[in-house]
Amino acid sequence: ITDASGNAVTDITSLTYKTVTDGKGASISGYDITNKSGLITLFDKKAITASPTKTDEWNITVTFINYNADQSNNAGNTFSGKILIQKEFIPIVLSDVCTNENNLATCITTLANKSEPSITNIYHHDANLENGAEDNSYRYAGASNSINNYICLGSNESTCPDANLFRIIGVFEDQTKVIQVTPFYDRWDADDSNTWSTSSLNTYLNGTYLTSLGTLTDKIATTTWKVGGGTYANIQTSVPKTVYQYEVGSSASSTTNDAKIGLMYVSDYEYGASPSAWTLVGYNSSDATKSYRASRSINWMYLGLSEWTISRISTSSYNSFGVLNDGSVDNGPARTLLRFRPSFYLEFSVKYVSGSGTQSDPIRIN
């Protein structure tokens, strides 16, 4: 970024100014936006002189640096941006719209409605959202480092312990759904059965794990989890909208389980990706670019590890669906050892206390 005289602007506090050397030995200086998305503030509260007339001029150049390294992961990706000059304040994080003792779920929906999805990474899945779930939920979607949805639960320590750090999936019927950041490791079921209500993992989650949460359990809603799953065709090789319909929507099985703790759905994982991925299928044997393998860099729910979901394959008595370490959706025997992340819904009565939602400043509740 340079001013009208060609002088480099180096005092923007929201970005890191760097000097690097490209593959040909050329030195390039500027602000690093490699992992940036959403709204980036360049100048804030800048006074504009109206009289006498004055023209402020800046030149903004975006450079893709060609290093001597494998950059094949960038193939097929696109870049776009807009320059905004605004008078009104645009809210970016929860603390911009929420104060102590507001309902957490209301804070999230208010932020979404007062801002734009490209800024907050919160998408309202109403009938107007292309390829959305159409369940009126509000879901966080996009690259992990661009989403401010961290929440600290069950701890008042200034630095949230790993065991207490969660991320918000979204708001569903006034309840806030969260998923633990740090995964565990176990079988879906020790006896290799894919009936969730009697599975060893469900027993652990709603027994030992739930007890370990202490008083936080009072803030967790008892939920009717839809656990009938679906077929290979309508879960593993379908687009998110179809997956949602067969997992929890109008075409879902009547098989349910009432409990406080569960796991993510396949559709939770898939709708965690940026909207550009919502036309992909979970798995494509002939073309990985058409499957969720291609969405890894734009899906905050992707861990880089193989992990279980709560959904089973309905045409089998022992296989359940999971996410592979390559980002695609697959299924396997319930006795298989994989990672899993506990997930649950917070009651609507839960109040926001503080926090912007970043990993270092997670949301705190009452």
Segments from the language model and where they lie:
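Surface-exposed interaction patch
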Residues: 1-31
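Short edge-strand/loop segments of extracellular domains
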Residues: 2-3, 84-88, 183-185
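Intrinsically disordered, low-complexity coil segments
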Residues: 23-25, 46-54, 155-164
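C-terminal, structured domain-capping segment
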Residues: 40-94
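Collagenous Gly-X-Y triple-helix signature in extracellular proteins
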Residues: 93-366
